[in-house]
Amino acid sequence: VRGPVVALTNEYAGSDGDIFSHAFKMFGVGPLLGKRTWGGVIGIWPRHELVDGAITTQPEFSFWFADVGFAVENYGTEPDIVVENPPNADAEDDDVQLDAAVKKALELLEGTPVGPPEDVGPYPKLTPPETLPQ
């Protein structure tokens, strides 16, 4: 990506939303804006079927990060810039968090030269082979 990147998260981001938000912040891709994620990253595998067809699950998979270990679970990830969405924002069709992210991206663009990517040479030939290997 050439140019600045910002990401939004909030208290409704859990599971992959927690993981993405934390990885985005940990790798320093750009500023993370919004509210702290809810902290539910333990994975399940619905593989135990009961006689009535219902399926049971139990916590099985945990996520570990180089900077905080297992600490995203039960806490979440704090954004770099906290932006509250007021309770009436949805009713008024107002997205304060999105507006803040766009404003931040535009601020970052002011100090970042952005242009077309450099020529990387000839593109690879991606046509399928005429015959598939046996």
Question: Which ranges hold each PLM region?
Answer:
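C-terminal "post-core" interaction segments
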Residues: 1-134
